[in-house]
A protein has these predicted regions:
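Intrinsically disordered, low-complexity coil segments
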Residues: 134-142, 228-231
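Predominantly late transmembrane helices and immediately cytosolic-facing juxtamembrane segments
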Residues: 12, 16-125, 146-168, 172-199, ...
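PEST-like, low-complexity acidic/proline-rich intrinsically disordered segments
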Residues: 1-13
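Membrane-interface helix-loop junction between the first two transmembrane segments
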Residues: 109, 128-139, 161
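Structured surface patches comprising rigid loops and adjacent beta-strands/short helices at the edges
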Residues: 443-447
Length: 481
């Protein structure tokens, strides 16, 4: 296989036995390191299991090949070439074929999974349409409660599907059929996600129940026919079958109850689903998720949700609208996205061993906050809607968004967690000050917008500063170099 390298390509990496700036760590006692330019790593030790041993053996093989190539090209390798060699090695590891690293290649997000996520973009858009009718007044609490409930239901379906396919999804026809069936049923749910959703109770809840039944079947099918599962997998899959069937049963029972009494019991099903999944934490912890795959799935849905926010601020750009406000709204969206993107690219430990439950739960809340911020921005572009309540909604959702970002700290790279208490202190202080200022200045839209802009970029600046102080070098994956 031909190798293609870009001599100017650089990438920040974290390798065992090597500092984040490419220098060798001072306290390394490894007989394999014979010259400063070599980057061999330990392959044995109490902290290295069989899988990690295979990874490190393969890495050392690539190190030797890359170093030999460099020596042949230049007739020798000096200490000054150490950093470029490091990037070259890592680039080669990342671009090797799947066959060359069989058994140690991370699971990639399938195109079918990306296709599946598009139905959630449509679902969130139809739910957001709940607020299109409020051109002259702030939405009542009943509309906000409906919005929160419908969004939580859609995100639960996404969460359960993502968790299953992260651990047990394969390039199998049955998996693809299951995804397409759920996509079809989500259309029925989305079409009933409006002010009159109770008028579509049977349609909406019938589709929801069938989705739970489909998820239960996939877990049962994997439990019954898979030959590559152990006792932990059986426990997880068995619990999935039971909990999905119970939630399905609650949803189905709620239909005749609503038809005869008018009572809405389906929120109990929603609460049960989330609580049951949280109760499985120990089993999921014993069988860690494929975190790189999970992080990528979450990143893609966050990007799609921010795409809805970009569409949401379009009304600020209509003829006759305040140019300053459309500039500020655009910069706010960019700043929020950059904070998440930078954190995902540079701070998040993509090889974390974790159950994934907490990571997904934080993202469910974050996507709800992003979607709610989109609604707030749309309302802020409507001059006849009372200013103070929509301003405070915006402030509250930003507060939730950045609290979620703080929650990701537990999934950060270990060498970046040293500053976590400063990180918490700075951002919490900024949020409290921001909320207080918005209570005082929320009656003036321009002042409130400027305060919000200052918050968004001050937090982004804090993240950059703490990352810089942790690495002692401003090298942040293309954002700043």
């Amino acid at each position: 296989m031909a190798d293609h390298y870009d001599e100017n390509y650089e990438e920040v990496v974290s390798l065992p036995g090597v500092d984040t700036d490419g220098e060798r760590t001072e306290n390394i006692d490894d007989g394999r390191i014979r010259r400063p330019a070599e980057f061999f790593v330990r392959t044995t030790g109490d902290d290295i299991d069989e899988q990690e041993h295979a990874r490190r053996e393969y890495f050392n093989k690539v190190v030797g090949e890359a170093e030999n190539e460099a020596i042949q090209e230049k007739g020798g390798l000096d200490v000054g070439a150490e950093s470029s060699l490091l990037y070259r090695i890592w680039s080669r590891v990342n671009h090797e074929s799947e066959e060359a690293v069989a058994g140690i290649v991370e699971k990639k997000v399938e195109y079918v999974e990306l296709f599946f996520d598009l139905i959630f973009v449509y679902s969130l858009r139809t739910i957001n349409a709940l607020f299109h009718a409020y051109e002259h007044s702030f939405p009542p609490m009943s509309a906000i409660q409906t919005f929160l409930f419908l969004t939580a239901v859609v995100m639960q379906v996404w969460m359960f599907t993502t968790m299953f396919f992260n651990r047990y999804g394969r390039k199998a026809l049955r998996d693809y059929i299951s995804i397409f069936i759920n996509m079809y049923l989500l259309y029925y749910m989305a079409s009933g996600s409006n002010h009159h959703w109770l008028d579509h109770y049977i349609r909406y809840h019938g589709a929801w129940a069938l989705i739970m039944l489909n998820l239960a079947y996939r877990s049962w099918d994997k439990l019954r026919f898979s030959t590559h599962i152990d006792d932990i997998d059986r426990k997880i899959l068995g619990a999935n079958v039971m909990h999905h069937l119970i939630e399905c049963g609650i949803i189905l029972v709620s239909i005749p109850v609503h038809e005869t009494t008018g009572l809405v019991l389906s929120p109990l099903a929603l609460i049960y689903g989330y609580a049951a999944k949280a109760a499985e934490h120990r089993a999921y912890k014993a069988r860690p998720c494929d975190f790189p795959h999970l992080a990528e799935r979450n990143l893609l849905l966050v990007i799609l949700t921010f795409g809805e926010m970009i569409i949401g601020i379009a009304s600020f750009f209509e003829t006759g609208k305040n140019v300053l406000l459309n500039i500020i709204s655009f910069l706010i969206v960019i700043g929020m996205f950059l904070s998440y993107g930078f954190f995902n690219d540079n701070v998040l430990d993509h090889h974390k061993k974790t159950s994934g439950l907490g990571f997904l739960a934080i993202h469910v809340i974050m996507i709800l906050a992003i979607n709610s911020t989109t609604i707030a921005l749309e309302l802020l572009a409507r001059p006849l809607v009372p200013l103070f309540p929509k301003t405070m909604w915006m402030a509250a959702m930003l507060f939730v968004y950045y609290i979620c970002l703080l929650g990701f700290e537990r999934y950060a790279k270990e060498h970046l967690r040293a500053n976590r208490f400063r990180f918490f202190g700075y951002i919490l202080s900024a949020l409290i000050i921001y909320f207080g200022l918005m209570l005082l200045a929320g009656h003036n839209q321009t002042v409130g917008a400027l305060i919000t802009l200052a918050l968004v970029y001050s937090i982004f600046g804090v993240i950059l500063h703490l990352h810089h102080s942790s690495l002692r070098k401003m090298k942040v994956g293309g954002y700043i170099s």
